[in-house]
Design a protein with these regions (language model features):
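Carboxylate-rich, polar loop motifs that coordinate divalent cations or form catalytic acidic clusters
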Residues: 67
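Generic local-structure boundary detector
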Residues: 58-60, 78-82, 118, 179
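Serine/threonine-rich, low-complexity linker/repeat segments that form flexible spacers/stalks
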Residues: 2-59, 125-184, 188-193
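A surface/secretory-pathway sequence property marking extracellular, secreted
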Residues: 3-32, 70-109, 193-197
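Short, hydrophobic beta-strand segments
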Residues: 108-113, 119-130
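Short proline/glycine- and polar residue-rich coil/turn motifs
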Residues: 40-43, 97-102, 110-117
Length: 197
């Protein structure tokens, strides 16, 4: 049974419950290969997000031709994007627009919306662990992907010699540019036994 059309507060058709398939793909050579439904993806990986939707006949309000879709956290665009959307035959049926770091995609259709049609929307982005709110999950349609956080620590150790050259003071600076993802980080700084006399 076809899903009942739903509308946002501005009267735009919502595609969120009209999806027929979704995929997150990674590039293998020159080809985008869809990941398995429960795949893990490393933070910072370049991916292609794809949704396929089926719009029932006359789903748009009178005179309307715009629809929206809410992207899941973790795959928000890293810049403003726009482009064409196609039907199941590859024919252009309208355009999409996305704003940097916004979850809402806006579609403007130019095809005959009085008949049922299927459309495909794709865009490329970078997986972002921090956007997932700390649980590391991306929920796209009925699929859930796990983001593996990318850990990195930068350390720096500097020393200062006292004026009388009898003491050395050390300063150790540690920073985590990608955050610690709620993981405990333990730093140990020891002098070798032969250097303690």
């Amino acid at each position: 049974a076809a899903a009942t059309p739903q509308y946002d507060s501005e009267g735009n058709l919502k595609l969120d419950n009209l999806l027929t398939s979704t995929a997150i793909s990674i590039k293998q050579g020159n080809v985008w290969e869809p990941l398995d439904d429960a795949a893990s993806i490393k933070d910072g990986t370049q991916v292609q997000v794809e949704i396929v939707y089926s719009v029932p006949a006359n789903a748009f309000p009178d005179g309307g031709n715009t629809a929206t879709y809410t992207l899941p956290a973790g795959v928000y665009p890293k810049g403003d994007l726009s482009g064409n959307i196609t039907d199941s035959t590859g024919m252009i049926i309208g355009t999409f627009a996305l704003s940097k770091k916004s979850p809402t995609v806006t579609f403007t259709f130019s095809n005959d919306t009085s008949r049922t049609f299927t459309g495909t929307f794709k865009f490329n982005t970078t997986i972002n662990y921090a956007e997932t709110g700390g649980d590391g999950k991306i929920h796209l349609g009925e699929k859930t992907y796990t983001v593996e956080p990318e850990y990195s620590l930068n350390t720096k150790k500097e020393h200062t010699l006292s004026e009388d050259k009898s003491k050395v003071s050390y300063t150790v600076t540690v920073n985590a540019p990608n955050g610690t993802h709620d993981q405990t980080v333990t730093i140990t700084d020891r002098l070798a036994a032969e250097n303690t006399a």
